[in-house]
């Protein structure tokens, strides 16, 4: 991990083994997503930014090749909620209603840096806005807090969650 950190700091290309395959990577950032550590990197083979589970990276070797990368893309990962974050997709707004039973938790620890309160109700329930890049960034969180979270918008997110619940209940009854 020290070699990876050094490569990020010096913007140096690395070679490593990931999932039993040799990789050439441009390491960009180490990030904790859902309690797992990931290396955010530009992978030459796929010609895209990828997330690799940090503990699965083996035999790291620094190369004598330095690189530059768009800092805006790298800083975009600061708003990632989980590994479903998509760096090349423009973030879009979702709005949620948070019942008073859970609102304090989201005020204490925001979902990500884009969270803002749109409305506070007398009973301490709130409406919030958050920016995401993929529905799967937020669906697990919403489903874990049901019935205390409701989707205000977009409607497609609401339909996806409803479909997930219908599928679940069809298998359990």
PLM feature segments, named:
Residues 1-95, 104:
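Core beta-strand-centered patch of the WYL/Sm-like small regulatory domain
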Residues 79-173:
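Polybasic (Lys/Arg-rich)
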